[in-house]
Amino acid sequence: MHPPMSPKRGPHRLARWVLALLLALGTTWLAPAPAMAAMDVAKQVLIGADFHDQDLRGATFNLTNLRDATFAGSDLQGASLFGAKLQDADLSNTNLREATLDSAIFDGTNLTNAVLEDAFAFNTKFTNVVIEGADFTNVPLRGDALKTLCGVASGTNPVTGRDTRSSLGCS
Protein backbone atom coordinates (compact mmCIF):
# COMPACT_ATOMS: atom_id res chain seq x y z
CA MET A 1 0.00 0.00 0.00
CA HIS A 2 1.10 3.49 -0.82
CA PRO A 3 0.82 6.23 1.75
CA PRO A 4 -1.86 8.76 0.90
CA MET A 5 -0.57 11.70 -1.16
CA SER A 6 -0.27 14.95 0.67
CA PRO A 7 -2.55 17.59 -0.84
CA LYS A 8 0.43 20.00 -0.96
CA ARG A 9 2.75 17.59 -2.83
CA GLY A 10 0.37 16.47 -5.58
CA PRO A 11 -0.28 19.76 -7.38
CA HIS A 12 3.42 20.72 -7.36
CA ARG A 13 4.45 17.41 -8.87
CA LEU A 14 1.78 17.77 -11.57
CA ALA A 15 2.78 21.39 -12.24
CA ARG A 16 6.44 20.39 -12.64
CA TRP A 17 5.49 17.57 -15.00
CA VAL A 18 3.32 19.90 -17.14
CA LEU A 19 6.07 22.53 -17.18
CA ALA A 20 8.66 19.94 -18.27
CA LEU A 21 6.34 18.74 -21.03
CA LEU A 22 5.70 22.28 -22.27
CA LEU A 23 9.43 23.05 -22.28
CA ALA A 24 10.18 19.89 -24.23
CA LEU A 25 7.50 20.66 -26.80
CA GLY A 26 8.49 24.31 -26.98
CA THR A 27 12.12 23.57 -27.74
CA THR A 28 11.20 21.24 -30.59
CA TRP A 29 8.87 23.84 -32.09
CA LEU A 30 11.41 26.63 -31.70
CA ALA A 31 14.39 24.63 -32.94
CA PRO A 32 15.60 25.62 -36.40
CA ALA A 33 14.44 23.40 -39.22
CA PRO A 34 17.17 21.13 -40.57
CA ALA A 35 18.70 22.28 -43.84
CA MET A 36 17.47 20.49 -46.90
CA ALA A 37 19.93 18.05 -48.35
CA ALA A 38 21.63 19.42 -51.45
CA MET A 39 20.26 18.17 -54.75
CA ASP A 40 22.32 15.44 -56.46
CA VAL A 41 21.64 14.89 -60.14
CA ALA A 42 25.06 13.63 -61.17
CA LYS A 43 25.39 11.75 -64.47
CA GLN A 44 21.91 12.72 -65.69
CA VAL A 45 20.68 14.00 -69.03
CA LEU A 46 18.84 17.25 -68.28
CA ILE A 47 18.83 18.90 -71.70
CA GLY A 48 16.73 22.06 -71.64
CA ALA A 49 16.00 21.77 -67.90
CA ASP A 50 14.63 24.87 -66.17
CA PHE A 51 16.37 25.70 -62.88
CA HIS A 52 15.92 29.50 -63.02
CA ASP A 53 15.68 31.49 -59.78
CA GLN A 54 16.29 28.45 -57.56
CA ASP A 55 18.36 27.89 -54.44
CA LEU A 56 20.80 25.21 -55.59
CA ARG A 57 23.58 25.85 -53.08
CA GLY A 58 25.80 22.79 -52.78
CA ALA A 59 23.95 20.89 -55.52
CA THR A 60 25.82 18.24 -57.51
CA PHE A 61 25.61 18.21 -61.31
CA ASN A 62 28.80 16.21 -61.93
CA LEU A 63 29.08 14.83 -65.49
CA THR A 64 25.51 15.97 -66.20
CA ASN A 65 24.37 17.00 -69.69
CA LEU A 66 22.83 20.44 -69.16
CA ARG A 67 22.75 21.60 -72.79
CA ASP A 68 20.25 24.48 -73.21
CA ALA A 69 19.46 24.43 -69.47
CA THR A 70 18.39 27.63 -67.72
CA PHE A 71 19.89 28.61 -64.37
CA ALA A 72 19.28 32.36 -64.73
CA GLY A 73 19.14 34.07 -61.35
CA SER A 74 19.89 30.89 -59.38
CA ASP A 75 22.15 30.51 -56.35
CA LEU A 76 24.71 27.81 -57.13
CA GLN A 77 27.18 28.74 -54.41
CA GLY A 78 29.39 25.75 -53.62
CA ALA A 79 27.70 23.62 -56.28
CA SER A 80 29.68 21.02 -58.17
CA LEU A 81 29.42 21.03 -61.96
CA PHE A 82 32.53 18.90 -62.51
CA GLY A 83 32.60 17.73 -66.14
CA ALA A 84 29.11 19.10 -66.81
CA LYS A 85 28.15 19.89 -70.40
CA LEU A 86 26.71 23.41 -70.40
CA GLN A 87 26.54 24.16 -74.12
CA ASP A 88 24.15 27.04 -74.85
CA ALA A 89 23.06 27.11 -71.19
CA ASP A 90 21.88 30.32 -69.51
CA LEU A 91 23.76 31.05 -66.29
CA SER A 92 23.15 34.79 -66.36
CA ASN A 93 22.85 36.53 -62.99
CA THR A 94 23.85 33.37 -61.11
CA ASN A 95 25.88 33.06 -57.93
CA LEU A 96 28.63 30.54 -58.71
CA ARG A 97 30.87 31.51 -55.78
CA GLU A 98 33.08 28.60 -54.66
CA ALA A 99 31.54 26.32 -57.31
CA THR A 100 33.52 23.46 -58.83
CA LEU A 101 33.51 23.95 -62.59
CA ASP A 102 36.60 21.91 -63.40
CA SER A 103 36.45 19.99 -66.70
CA ALA A 104 33.03 21.50 -67.51
CA ILE A 105 32.23 22.57 -71.06
CA PHE A 106 30.99 26.14 -71.48
CA ASP A 107 30.30 26.52 -75.21
CA GLY A 108 27.87 29.27 -76.19
CA THR A 109 27.07 29.63 -72.49
CA ASN A 110 25.62 32.90 -71.17
CA LEU A 111 27.46 34.02 -68.02
CA THR A 112 26.26 37.64 -68.13
CA ASN A 113 26.57 39.22 -64.65
CA ALA A 114 27.43 35.87 -63.04
CA VAL A 115 29.59 35.90 -59.90
CA LEU A 116 32.21 33.14 -60.09
CA GLU A 117 34.39 34.42 -57.24
CA ASP A 118 36.60 31.66 -55.76
CA ALA A 119 35.19 29.04 -58.15
CA PHE A 120 37.52 26.27 -59.33
CA ALA A 121 37.69 26.19 -63.13
CA PHE A 122 41.25 25.25 -64.05
CA ASN A 123 40.46 22.66 -66.74
CA THR A 124 37.19 24.21 -67.85
CA LYS A 125 36.61 24.71 -71.57
CA PHE A 126 35.28 28.17 -72.52
CA THR A 127 34.30 28.80 -76.16
CA ASN A 128 31.86 31.35 -77.59
CA VAL A 129 30.81 32.41 -74.08
CA VAL A 130 29.09 35.65 -73.11
CA ILE A 131 30.76 37.02 -69.98
CA GLU A 132 29.68 40.66 -69.93
CA GLY A 133 29.67 41.79 -66.30
CA ALA A 134 30.86 38.41 -64.98
CA ASP A 135 33.19 38.42 -61.95
CA PHE A 136 36.06 35.89 -62.09
CA THR A 137 37.88 37.07 -58.95
CA ASN A 138 40.26 34.37 -57.60
CA VAL A 139 39.26 31.80 -60.26
CA PRO A 140 42.23 29.69 -61.39
CA LEU A 141 42.22 29.37 -65.19
CA ARG A 142 44.57 27.80 -67.74
CA GLY A 143 46.38 30.20 -70.06
CA ASP A 144 44.34 29.24 -73.14
CA ALA A 145 41.04 29.76 -71.28
CA LEU A 146 42.25 33.09 -69.91
CA LYS A 147 43.21 34.24 -73.42
CA THR A 148 39.76 33.27 -74.75
CA LEU A 149 37.94 35.01 -71.90
CA CYS A 150 40.05 38.18 -72.04
CA GLY A 151 39.21 38.40 -75.75
CA VAL A 152 35.50 38.85 -74.96
CA ALA A 153 35.56 40.34 -71.44
CA SER A 154 33.57 43.52 -70.87
CA GLY A 155 31.31 45.21 -68.36
CA THR A 156 31.09 45.52 -64.60
CA ASN A 157 29.34 43.09 -62.30
CA PRO A 158 26.25 44.70 -60.73
CA VAL A 159 26.57 42.66 -57.51
CA THR A 160 30.29 42.99 -56.72
CA GLY A 161 31.03 46.18 -58.66
CA ARG A 162 34.11 44.55 -60.20
CA ASP A 163 35.17 45.02 -63.80
CA THR A 164 35.17 41.73 -65.73
CA ARG A 165 38.56 42.33 -67.37
CA SER A 166 40.14 43.27 -64.02
CA SER A 167 38.65 40.23 -62.27
CA LEU A 168 40.31 38.04 -64.91
CA GLY A 169 43.62 39.90 -64.68
CA CYS A 170 43.53 40.78 -68.40
CA SER A 171 46.24 43.17 -69.58
PLM region spans:
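Tandem repeat scaffolds
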Residues: 2, 6-18, 25-171
